[in-house]
């Protein structure tokens, strides 16, 4: 058999640093992190069998004398090899033709109700769909008013910039100041996203101020990222610059050689904290890159396999599980927003769910595990929506897709019924618009605020699920769910709970999803009731107010989405203005925002 040469799939940087390459185009994850151009050379690597044949066995070659074949034998052997190669090529081509014929026969035997495959509705795709709706449905009225039909690209929404190394904060901050900010992190962040055991982290903190050389570099990355998160909660300009400086220090530390070379649990923890801050300052492309690196380390450490925890104590095994599930939530939700393939969704996951008994080791707020466990279960269902409803196999047949939709719908209802009693009573209050926030104490207000975010995430999941449901019932579920979600924003979230908003809001429950449902319903003229149409427009204003409110909290992305929603509201107003049923009504954008 002839030797086979295989093309090397890794880029030049990954081959040079001897690290795993995920082979993404136009740039792999490692090149994004190291800020280098990604090049895939045409270099070939010879297979083991070919190398062995070329090099031979020196011991045997020296022991056996070489024989010089006659010219006639050489010519005959060459002709025989040529005939064998030609026959092999012809057989291979015949097999290809047979496979093609069989695939055509299989396709012709399938039902004729094949439907076009649709990708999962990423944020950029949702905005493009709304733009397309403006261009098609309102085109006949273009002479009467100017339409905001400018396109919003992926690069417009998600900045691809990276931190500036010149702003790195290289000195250890004051101990008392750092202590207050670390305590804030464990009370307000780590309780919902349990990345660290509080006691273990504080032990390293004390060690840092005794002797910096005794602290691991990965923990130092986490320390500066925690300070960046804590400092960013202040609206003062100097604190914002200080937060960016802390994060730049973390970014500088992970650029050191060897950080991505060997996978460690401490490094994954550091990357998770950096992801949270990057989302806060709208560096969402950096979120995706850091998430990819964390997933590679998870795969190398087998955190997704419960059998890998057998050699660890119960406490350490629980920490490994929680780190995996946090990364799972981040990676699945970011891939849905970006519309990119997920790494962890294709893996065989058998990791156990978080154990409530260990919640007290992560934060003084024991109810934080209620939110975290609910997010884990809901994210699993989100991934199931994409893999079963938006996959190639199920979208090729409308009946299969509708069956999958209702099966997952039943699972979502079971998820809601199985919520802990503390969360279920808040879900009921949110559905009924019951004003209970002021009646709660401070800790319960925090839990209620977090429950609102879970509720909005649940609503978005229902909308994504029934977006492809062609039945009337599915369309009604989408519309009713969108109205309930925006009602929550309007009555509960904007004032006074916006100050407690999660830094990952765009990935977990971006309100543009229900906004698009109401906008499409209005512009398509599907709402026969004038009063309900006015109420839906008012709800759209509430989404715009949400983004305006989050400009100081959510960075540039919230400001861009505020501008986008304002343009679409303007288009909906103009559509109303040319309809006979609405000619007598006037709209004032400012009146809805006061």
Curated annotation (Swiss-Prot):
Signal peptide: none annotated. It is a single-pass membrane protein. It is found in: Nucleus; Membrane. Residues 11-38 bind DNA. InterPro entries: AtrR-like (IPR050987), Transcription_factor_dom_fun (IPR007219), Zn2-C6_fun-type_DNA-bd_sf (IPR036864), Zn2Cys6_DnaBD (IPR001138). The chain crosses the membrane at residues 503-523. The keyword Cytoplasm does not apply. Its main location: nucleus. GO terms for biological process: DNA-templated transcription; positive regulation of transcription by RNA polymerase II; regulation of transcription by RNA polymerase II. Keywords: DNA-binding, Membrane, Metal-binding, Nucleus, Transcription, Transcription regulation, Transmembrane, Transmembrane helix, Zinc. SUPFAM superfamilies: Zn2/Cys6 DNA-binding domain. One of its GO terms (cellular component) is membrane. It comes from the Eukaryota. GO terms for molecular function: DNA-binding transcription factor activity, RNA polymerase II-specific; RNA polymerase II cis-regulatory region sequence-specific DNA binding; sequence-specific DNA binding; zinc ion binding. PANTHER family: TRANSCRIPTION FACTOR PDR1 (PTHR46910), ZN(II)2CYS6 TRANSCRIPTION FACTOR (EUROFUNG) (PTHR46910:SF37). This is Uncharacterized transcriptional regulatory protein PB24D3.01. It comes from Schizosaccharomyces pombe (strain 972 / ATCC 24843).
């Amino acid at each position: 058999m002839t030797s086979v040469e295989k093309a090397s799939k890794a880029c030049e940087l990954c081959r040079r640093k001897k690290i795993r390459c995920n082979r993404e185009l136009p740039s792999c994850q490692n090149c994004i992190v190291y800020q280098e151009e990604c090049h895939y050379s045409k270099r070939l690597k010879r297979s083991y069998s070919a190398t062995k044949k070329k090099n031979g066995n020196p011991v045997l070659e020296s022991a056996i004398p070489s024989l010089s074949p006659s010219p006639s034998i050489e010519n005959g052997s060459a002709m025989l090899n040529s005939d064998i190669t030609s026959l092999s090529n012809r057989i291979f081509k015949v097999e290809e033709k047979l496979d093609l014929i069989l695939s055509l026969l299989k396709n012709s035997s399938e039902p004729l109700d094949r439907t076009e495959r649709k990708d999962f509705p990423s944020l950029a795709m949702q905005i493009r769909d709304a733009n397309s709706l403006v261009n098609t449905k309102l085109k006949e009225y273009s002479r009467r008013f100017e339409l905001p039909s400018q396109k919003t690209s992926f690069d417009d929404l998600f900045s691809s910039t990276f931190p500036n190394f010149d702003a790195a904060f290289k000195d250890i901050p004051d101990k008392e100041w750092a202590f207050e900010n670390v305590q804030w992190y464990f009370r307000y962040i780590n309780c919902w996203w349990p990345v660290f055991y509080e006691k273990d982290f504080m032990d390293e903190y004390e060690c840092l101020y005794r002797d910096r050389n005794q602290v691991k570099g990965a923990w130092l990355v986490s320390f500066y990222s925690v300070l960046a998160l804590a400092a960013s909660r202040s609206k003062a300009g100097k604190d914002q610059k200080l937060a960016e400086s802390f994060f730049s220090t973390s970014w500088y530390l992970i650029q050191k050689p060897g950080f991505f070379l060997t996978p460690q649990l401490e490094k994954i923890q550091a990357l998770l904290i950096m992801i949270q801050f990057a989302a806060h300052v709208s560096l969402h492309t950096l979120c995706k890159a850091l998430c990819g690196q964390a997933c590679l380390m998870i795969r190398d450490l087998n955190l997704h396999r419960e059998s890998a925890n057998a050699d660890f104590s119960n406490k350490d095994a629980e920490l490994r599980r929680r780190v995996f599930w946090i990364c799972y939530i981040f990676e699945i939700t970011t891939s849905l927003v970006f519309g990119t393939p997920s790494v962890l969704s294709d893996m065989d996951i058998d990791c156990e769910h978080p154990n409530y008994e260990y919640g007290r080791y992560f934060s003084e707020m024991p109810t934080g595990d209620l939110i975290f466990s609910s997010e884990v279960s809901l994210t699993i269902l989100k991934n199931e929506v994409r893999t079963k409803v938006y996959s190639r196999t199920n979208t090729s047949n409308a009946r299969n897709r509708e069956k999958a939709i209702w099966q997952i719908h039943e699972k979502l209802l079971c998820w809601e019924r199985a919520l802990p009693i503390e969360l279920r009573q808040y879900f009921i209050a949110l559905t009924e618009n019951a004003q209970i926030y002021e009646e709660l104490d401070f800790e319960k207000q925090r839990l209620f605020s977090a429950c609102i975010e879970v509720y909005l995430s649940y609503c978005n999941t229902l909308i994504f699920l029934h977006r492809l449901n062609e039945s009337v019932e599915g369309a009604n579920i989408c519309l009713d769910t969108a109205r309930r979600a925006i009602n929550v924003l309007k009555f509960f979230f904007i004032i006074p709970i916006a100050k407690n908003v999660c830094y990952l809001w765009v990935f977990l429950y971006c309100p543009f999803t229900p906004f698009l449902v109401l906008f499409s319903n209005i512009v398509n003229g599907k709402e026969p009731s004038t009063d309900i149409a006015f109420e839906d427009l008012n709800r759209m204003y509430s989404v715009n107010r949400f983004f305006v409110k989050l400009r100081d909290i959510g960075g540039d992305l919230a400001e861009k989405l505020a501008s986008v929603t304002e343009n679409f509201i303007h288009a909906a107003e103009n559509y109303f203005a040319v309809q006979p049923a609405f000619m007598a009504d006037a709209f004032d954008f400012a009146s809805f925002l006061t």
